[in-house]
Regions:
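Extracellular repeat-rich scaffold modules on cell surfaces
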Residues: 1, 19-130, 140
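Aromatic/basic micro-patches that form nucleic-acid/chromatin recognition or nuclease catalytic surfaces
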Residues: 4-6
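Extracellular beta-strand/loop-rich repeat segments of large surface/secreted proteins
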Residues: 9-11, 130-211
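Conserved Rossmann-like nucleotide-binding pocket used by diverse enzymes
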Residues: 14
């Protein structure tokens, strides 16, 4: 598969529509050197897309390099790779991001999952769901998640979204702000969406103060 990388320095790259296939890589600075960060803003064309390739710093080992995603537009992006390292975090400004990696494989093989953790395993939130954003899916998020918008486990049906790091690092938590919503599909008492959090669940009274 192909590799999409950036030049040196701190870069912001805006791509209206981005699709990646399994075997491809969405990366940062092409030379794997600390201090060169890349943030991809995607989804501006308001269409759905799949990110099936890996998302990680060049080489996949230098956790000091940030590779981040910013989701704009009203479409839905689906992330399906099992061993991503979105070291610069994910911000969902609008539309939806479905994290749909294979949860069983991720847990059994102790992989990083659909999102992974931040550069240097930083403890602050790595996923921000803004007021107009939705986070859903049936996979795993390996970093603390801060929600001003909506968390909706599943993707077109009953499912479980897991916020947990299977690599053995400190467990991520979930922070809900005043206007945050958790949207569940319930058929009956035995068939319903679930949200699993490996770390702490926190309530924070701060309103959205940035986008």
């Amino acid at each position: 598969g192909a590799t999409l990388a950036s030049e040196s320095g701190k870069r912001g790259l805006r791509i209206g529509h981005l699709e990646t296939e399994s075997g491809s890589v969405l990366s940062g600075y092409i030379k794997d050197k600390t201090g060169n960060d890349a943030f991809y803003m995607v989804g501006g064309d308001n269409q759905d897309a799949n990110l099936a390739g890996r998302i990680m710093p060049m080489g996949g080992t230098n956790l000091n390099v940030k590779v981040g995603l910013v989701k704009e537009g009203t479409g839905t992006y689906r992330i399906t790779a099992n061993n991503n390292l979105v070291t610069g975090g994910l911000r969902i400004l609008n539309g939806a991001v479905m994290v749909n990696n294979d949860l069983e494989k991720t847990e059994q093989e102790k992989l990083t999952g659909g999102i992974g953790h931040l550069a240097n395993n930083a403890s602050e939130a790595g996923v921000y769901v803004m007021t107009k954003g939705i986070l859903g899916g049936i996979g795993s998020v390996g970093t603390t998640t801060d929600v001003y918008g909506t968390v909706a486990p599943g993707d077109g049906g009953i499912g479980t979204l897991t916020i947990k790091d299977f690599t053995g690092s400190a467990q991520p938590g979930l922070t809900l702000h005043p206007k945050a919503k958790i949207r569940m599909e319930v058929t009956d008492r035995d068939h319903h969406d679930q949200l699993t959090v490996g770390g702490l669940l926190a309530l924070d009274n701060r309103m959205e103060d940035f986008t």
